[in-house]
Every structure is written in structure tokens, then in C-alpha cells.
């Protein structure tokens, strides 16, 4: 896999090639296992696992493509992802007619937040939504003059921004991080490694849930999620992260000794 990627992308650093190889290798392995299970035992119900694998192929392809086509496209891609999440939460939770103006300001916060990430202006990036927008949005709601249910709207809108924009925008900020000496993958490598860890966590939660799952977390919301699967996935992913070489480890390993 690494040799093939070296031929296709000769300018990629070794760290990036390793991360991409891990992501593609895991997906290829999962696809082969599903293919063999269908051939050996056609009656086995693997529809859920097949859907997960297809989703991960799409997500991994989009992330890898966005990262390597252009840095600018990566920022736009992640901003669009935030917009989709914001719109989904807005449509599910439901708001008053009087909240439309504040929702518009919430949408306007998305390009501003990602532009701050693009500039790597950490001081403004880290306070824009949890401080500035937390003051602007309630003010906009109050100025509308309709105070019925305003407290609920304030809380929902602020935390929709935190979840869908502030949280996801940290992925974009990874792209703006300066390269470390001895770690040539830069922010792109960190972002793709995070995608790989998320993929591993999803797989391990599914496996542990099938093996040991007894106690459901939210039966009415997600009946297939269990505490055993959740804890098994978190512990497995943490162990993998702890044993994997970090940028600091790579930098130290390549630094010349003082002897």
C-alpha cells in the first residue's frame, strides 16, 4: 500500500502515506470480510455493518480528497459540514418564528469562524462563538420583542453553534497549525489521523457492542448503542492512540543526538 501511494503521490511525506494507508487498509479489510461473510453465509444479516462500511468509504474519500486537492477546499468542505449539522439540528429541535433573525446570525457565524481558523488567529478563534456569539444572539432575540419561550431559544441556539460549528471548526484549525520539525505531515496528517481514530472507534464500538452489549444507553434514541460497546470503543481507541507514534515522538526520534 505504501509503495503504491508513493507512486501515485510522490510528493507526500512518509507520515501522510502511513495515515492514508491505515485508513484505506482498514476499509479494504472490512469490505473483504463483508464479501466473504456474504459468500460463506448468505443468510447472515450484515446490513448494518455494510451500511457503516459504505458510509466510511464515502466519508474517508471526501476527507482525503478535500485535504489533498486544496487547503482552501478543505476549509470550505468543513464549513459546509458545519452548515449541514447546524441546519439538521435546527430542523429537528424546532424554533419560533421570532427566532429566524437570530438563526440567520448563527449561520453568518460559520464563515467567520472558519476564516479565523484559516488565519490561525487562535485568540479570536477560541472566543468568537463561546463569548461573542453568546452575547450577540441573546441580544438579537431580546430586540425582537417576543419573550415567550425566549430562554429555550437562547439555550438551543447557543449550543447548536457550539456543537455544529465551534466543535467541528477545530478540525479546520488543525490544517492551520505550523509544521513541527521532524513531522512533515503537518495539519493534514493530524486531521487524517483523527479521521482514522474515529473510524477505529466506530468499528470497535460495533464489535464490543455485539460481543458484550447488554445495557442500552438511549433505547428510544439509538437502540443499538450499549454501554459495553461505548466503553470498549473508547478504551480500545485510547490504547491505540497511546501506543501510536505522536508528532512529538516522531520529532524526537529524528532530532540529532547531543552526543
Task: Identify the function of each model-found stretch.
Residues 35-45, 204-225:
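Cytosolic, membrane-interface loops and tails of multi-pass inner-membrane proteins
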Residues 64-68, 115-125, 166-179, 237-241:
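Hydrophobic alpha-helical transmembrane segments in multi-pass integral membrane proteins
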Residues 71-83, 186-199, 258-259:
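Membrane-embedded alpha-helical segments that form the functional core of polytopic membrane enzymes
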Residues 138-139, 166-171, 196-207:
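Transmembrane alpha-helical segments that form the membrane-embedded catalytic/substrate-channel core
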Amino acid at each position: 500500500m505504501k509503495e503504491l501511494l508513493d507512486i501515485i503521490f510522490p510528493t507526500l511525506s512518509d507520515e501522510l502515506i502511513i495515515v492514508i494507508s491505515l485508513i484505506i487498509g482498514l476499509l479494504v479489510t472490512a469490505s473483504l470480510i463483508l464479501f466473504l461473510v456474504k459468500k460463506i453465509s448468505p443468510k447472515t444479516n450484515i446490513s448494518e455493518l455494510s451500511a457503516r462500511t459504505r458510509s466510511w468509504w464515502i466519508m474517508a474519500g471526501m476527507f482525503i480528497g478535500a485535504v489533498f486537492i486544496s487547503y482552501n477546499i478543505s476549509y470550505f468542505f468543513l464549513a459546509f459540514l458545519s452548515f449541514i449539522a447546524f441546519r439538521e439540528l435546527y430542523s429537528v429541535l424546532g424554533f419560533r418564528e421570532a427566532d429566524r433573525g437570530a438563526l440567520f446570525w448563527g449561520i453568518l457565524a460559520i464563515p467567520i469562524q472558519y476564516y479565523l481558523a484559516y488565519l490561525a488567529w487562535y485568540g479570536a478563534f477560541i472566543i468568537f462563538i463561546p463569548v461573542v456569539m453568546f452575547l450577540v444572539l441573546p441580544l438579537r432575540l431580546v430586540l425582537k420583542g417576543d419573550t415567550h419561550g425566549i430562554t429555550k431559544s437562547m439555550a438551543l441556539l447557543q449550543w447548536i453553534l457550539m456543537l455544529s460549528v465551534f466543535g467541528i471548526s477545530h478540525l479546520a484549525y488543525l490544517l492551520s497549525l505550523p509544521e513541527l520539525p521532524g513531522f512533515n505531515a503537518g495539519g493534514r496528517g493530524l486531521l487524517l489521523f483523527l479521521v482514522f481514530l474515529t473510524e477505529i472507534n466506530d468499528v470497535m464500538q460495533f464489535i464490543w457492542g455485539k460481543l458484550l452489549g447488554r445495557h442500552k444507553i438511549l433505547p428510544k434514541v439509538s437502540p443499538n448503542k450499549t454501554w459495553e460497546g461505548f466503553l470498549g470503543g473508547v478504551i480500545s481507541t485510547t490504547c491505540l492512540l497511546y501506543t501510536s507514534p505522536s508528532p512529538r515522538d516522531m520529532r524526537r526520534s529524528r532530532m540529532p543526538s547531543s552526543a
